[in-house]
From Swiss-Prot:
Protein name, UniProt field: Casparian strip membrane protein 2
Alphabetically ordered keywords of this record: Cell membrane, Cell wall biogenesis/degradation, Membrane, Transmembrane, Transmembrane helix
Residues exposed to the Cytoplasmic side: 1-41, 114-125, 200-204
Predominant subcellular localization, coarse grouping: membrane
Family: Belongs to the Casparian strip membrane proteins (CASP) family.
Length: 204
C-alpha cells in the first residue's frame, strides 16, 4: 500500500510542465512584434530614400521653370521678344508650389528618421500620411495646370486663335516641358509614399 502512494508525484510534474509552457507564449509574441517592427523599419528606410528622390524631382522642376527665360536674338526699335515663366501666372504658381513642396520634403526627413528608429510608433507615420496626401494634391495641381499651358504653347488653340510659340521660343518650351515632367515624377513619388504610410499603419 505504501508503494501506491508514489502516484502523487504526477500532478507535480504536470504543473511544472504547465509552468514551463507559459514563457513560450511570451516568446512567440515577442517574435511577432519584432517581425512586424523589422518589416516597418524596411518600409521606413524605403520611405526615406523616396523622399530624397522627391527632393531632387521637385527642386529640378522649380529650378528648371525658374530659369526658363529666353530672349530672341532679333528685336525692333520698340519691341524685344522675350518669354519667361513670370509672364504666365500659372508658371509663377508652379515655381512657388514646387519650391514649397521641396521645403516640405526637407522638413519631413527628420520625421521619416523617427519612423526608422521607432518603426512601431503610429503617430509619426500618421502625421506623414496626412501631410504627404495634402502636399501630393498641391504638387498634382501645379503639375496639371503647367502641363495645360505647356500644351497650348506647343500646339496653340485654333478655337481662340492662340498661336503656338514653341517654334520661336524653342529653349523656353523645352525647359518648361522638362519642369512639368519632373513635377509629375514628384507626384508619382508622393503616391508611393502615401501607399507606404498606409501599409505601415495597417501593420501596427
Amino acid at each position: 500500500m505504501k508503494n501506491e502512494s508514489t502516484f502523487i508525484d504526477v500532478p507535480a510534474d504536470s504543473s511544472s510542465a504547465m509552468k514551463g509552457k507559459a514563457p513560450l507564449i511570451g516568446v512567440a509574441k515577442d517574435h511577432t512584434a519584432s517581425g512586424s517592427g523589422g518589416y516597418n523599419r524596411g518600409l521606413s528606410i524605403f520611405d526615406f530614400l523616396l523622399r530624397l528622390a522627391a527632393i531632387v524631382a521637385a527642386s529640378v522642376a522649380a529650378g528648371t521653370m525658374f530659369t526658363s527665360d529666353e530672349t530672341l536674338p532679333f528685336f525692333t526699335q520698340f519691341l524685344q521678344f522675350e518669354a519667361g515663366y513670370d509672364d504666365l501666372p500659372t508658371f509663377q504658381f508652379f515655381v512657388i508650389a514646387m519650391s514649397l513642396v521641396s521645403g516640405y520634403i526637407v522638413l519631413s526627413l527628420p520625421i521619416s528618421v523617427v519612423t526608422i528608429v521607432r518603426p512601431l510608433a503610429a503617430a509619426p507615420r500618421l502625421l506623414l500620411l496626412v501631410l504627404d496626401t495634402a502636399v501630393m494634391g498641391l504638387t498634382m495641381a501645379a503639375a496639371s495646370s503647367a502641363a495645360a499651358i505647356s500644351y497650348v504653347a506647343h500646339n496653340g488653340n485654333q478655337n481662340t486663335n492662340w498661336l503656338p510659340i514653341c517654334q520661336q521660343f524653342f529653349d523656353f518650351c523645352q525647359k518648361t516641358s522638362g519642369a512639368v515632367v519632373s513635377s509629375f515624377v514628384a507626384v508619382v513619388f508622393f503616391m508611393i509614399l502615401v501607399v507606404l504610410s498606409g501599409v505601415a499603419l495597417e501593420r501596427h
